[in-house]
Regions:
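Flexible loop/turn connectors
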Residues: 229-336
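Short hydrophobic segments within beta-strands
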Residues: 66, 124, 146, 185-186, ...
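Alpha-helical recognition/docking segments in bacterial nutrient-uptake
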Residues: 3-4, 58-173, 236-240
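Short beta-strand segments enriched in small/hydrophobic residues
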Residues: 16-18, 55-71, 182-191
């Protein structure tokens, strides 16, 4: 448990204001008293530099990060890595609030009034509604989105996102250019997931296909441990196997690739597979996918957050990062 300024004051037998002055205005404190405070701080492993900055600025030096789903997923972990690289160097901590269910989401916003000790709130891939935005705004700190829904319309202070419409259209055009018309799209259950980005991704893919006279079959999976096995069961239960499969994310495409090959299918000869993310294993497996760069997006979001905290105006508060199609070896021209 971290020691507080109150703990230091109690151990040094001085007031909290004396501890504060020892850090921020040492010229107003006698050497004897200041030495007592510093000795107590050392014994309690109290962070002098951090506390001094907090006391001087009146800030918490803490950023709240709202994450939908599991934080060990590639996108979430990469985003947190990018945020931490910037915030850590500036003396800020990150408090992560993970919301994997509607209940956890409701609990967070119900408890929001007691969570005012943050300097900004960052919302990652979260399909947040107008009422929740108003609740966040009541804390009176900047709200920054990363791949979040309608950030400009819903009152975010700033936001970064990948162009999911462009990315999905690139994936759809790629498969159709290879001659595929019998396409399946695998996605997570929207009633379960709180991700916004994947919903826009799905809608754009379907729209591009339908514009070209193709109606993909949609398979829905959950986020359980055996979800890919269930998807393979769904695929094998179809009247016939699709010639191409587009996956909502690499986290579905990578295990699907292995499961299909275990069931006797050769990728891409029997079926083409395309993912979305260009995650850590995509290159080694030769997965055709759509690249996004969550670390870079998060770093930019963190820099904008710091500017907003300091009251500096942003030249471009809402930024869109382009998607990129990465063609590897899991997609090929239609063979049948």
């Amino acid at each position: 448990m971290k020691s507080s300024i109150q703990d230091v004051a109690q151990l040094a037998h001085v007031s909290i204001s004396t501890v504060s002055r020892s850090f921020t205005r040492p010229d107003l404190v006698s050497k004897t008293t200041r030495d007592k405070v510093m000795k107590a701080a050392d014994e309690l492993n109290f962070s002098i530099s951090r506390s001094a900055a907090a006391l001087k600025t009146g800030r918490a030096l803490r950023i709240a990060v709202l994450v939908s789903g599991r934080i060990n997923l590639w996108f979430s972990s990469s985003t947190i890595e990018g945020l931490n690289e910037i915030f850590h160097n500036e003396g800020y901590d990150i408090s992560i609030y993970q919301m994997s269910s509607i209940e956890e989401r409701r609990e967070f916003f119900d408890m929001l009034p007691v969570r005012r000790n943050v300097d900004a709130v960052i919302v990652i891939s979260f399909d947040i509604d107008a009422n929740e935005i108003e609740q966040l705004r009541s804390v009176n700190v900047p709200i920054i989105g990363i791949n979040s829904s309608l950030p400009e319309e819903r009152g975010f202070s700033a936001a970064v996102r990948i162009d999911d419409k462009q990315g999905s259209e690139l994936a759809a055009r790629h498969l159709m250019a290879l001659g595929h018309r019998d396409i399946a799209y695998i996605r997570t259950n929207r009633d379960v997931t709180l991700h916004f980005s994947v919903q826009g991704r799905f809608e754009s893919f379907m729209a591009r296909c339908k514009e070209n006279g193709v109606t993909p079959r949609v398979l829905v999976t959950d986020e359980s441990k055996n979800n890919i096995s269930k998807v393979v069961t769904q695929l094998l239960s179809l009247d016939h196997m699709p010639t191409a499969i587009a996956c909502q994310e690499d986290g579905i495409a990578v295990p699907l690739l292995f499961q299909l090959e275990r069931n006797g299918f050769t990728v891409p000869n029997d079926v083409s597979i395309i993912g979305y993310d260009d995650s850590i294993y995509a290159r080694d497996l030769g997965l055709t996918t759509v690249r996004q760069k969550p670390i870079e997006m998060a770093q930019e979001a963190a820099r904008m957050t710091l500017d907003l905290i300091e009251g500096r105006p942003l030249e471009q508060p809402f930024k869109t990062f382009p998607a990129q199609l990465i063609v590897r070896s899991t997609t090929a021209h239609l063979h049948r």
